[in-house]
Amino acid sequence: VWAGFDWIEGQAGTREAYRAGVALERPDRYFLVSNLVVLGVAVGPATVAALAWLRHRPTWWLAGGALAGVVVADLSTMSKGEVERIWLPAVPFLVLATATFPDLRWRRGWLAAQLAAALALQLVLRSPW
């Protein structure tokens, strides 16, 4: 209990309320995978690649902590289909991993990949924004 909030009781109450709603119609296994895929698309190919070979210790603590939080949230099944909103605070910490690319040539290449992915998504997906 910190500042009057019991995390365990809150998790149990949230799970009960969530299961009483539309969550019963959403398959857990599908969202365990698709949430992570959507997060990967949101952060882009450069971030996914940077996380794969991240060795810089201070950055690893930030990005790794955000990644651990995302995995725990995903395994709790409390974020089915809500990744774009619920996990948004983790995105900047994950993107920090791209600052550790070895040299300027790598950074430019991955920046181009990020740009291409963003343009492709914007062309393929219809968005009201």
Residue ranges of predicted features:
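Hydrophobic, aromatic-rich transmembrane alpha-helices
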Residues: 40-63, 67-74
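Membrane-lumen/periplasm interface segments of specific transmembrane helices
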Residues: 1-52
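Hydrophobic/aromatic-rich transmembrane helices and adjacent perimembrane loops
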Residues: 35-44, 82-102
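Membrane-interface catalytic loops of GT-C/OST-like multi-pass glycosylation enzymes that act
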Residues: 74-90, 126-129
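Hydrophobic alpha-helical membrane-interfacial segments at the cytosolic entry of transmembrane helices
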Residues: 1-4, 68, 116
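Membrane-interface junctions at the ends of membrane-embedded or membrane-associated helices
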Residues: 50-57, 98-111
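Signature aromatic-anchored transmembrane alpha helix within multi-pass, membrane-resident enzymes
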Residues: 103-127
